[in-house]
Amino acid sequence: MKKFNKDIGTYCEKLSCDYLIEHNFKILECNFKNFLGEIDIICIKNSILIIIEVKGRYNYEFGLPKESVSISKQKNIIKVTKSYINYKKLYNFNVRFDVIEIYLNKLNSSYKINHIKDAFRT
């Protein structure tokens, strides 16, 4: 099950990157990892550094995708973001935290993207 979830996560992240590029976001990182954790996508648009958590679902059995971005997950994303900003010296950017929800059908042949801007704050 873990490999299946990882494959779905990778697929959803690729769909998200394609969506963001199509909407004129500049992708800086996909799957950025350090000793603190991971950020799915880091990008820039209109001089804003945007940190994106990607969540995909086949159904609502476990709730909406955005609901799985818990307070503790948000705090971890914020910690990793601060570390990334220091590492890359990106001090002159405002930062926004978004969530991209992807709703998949059972065959992965169609999907719907919901981009939630400013989904949470520091």
Curated annotation (Swiss-Prot):
The terms under GO molecular function for this entry are: nucleic acid binding
The UniProt entry, under InterPro entries, shows: Restrct_endonuc-II-like, tRNA_endonuc-like_dom_sf, UPF0102_YraN-like
The lineage's top-level taxon is Bacteria
Pfam family of this protein, just one?
Answer: UPF0102
Q: Which family, according to the similarity comment?
A: Belongs to the UPF0102 family.
Q: What is this protein called?
A: UPF0102 protein CLL_A1253
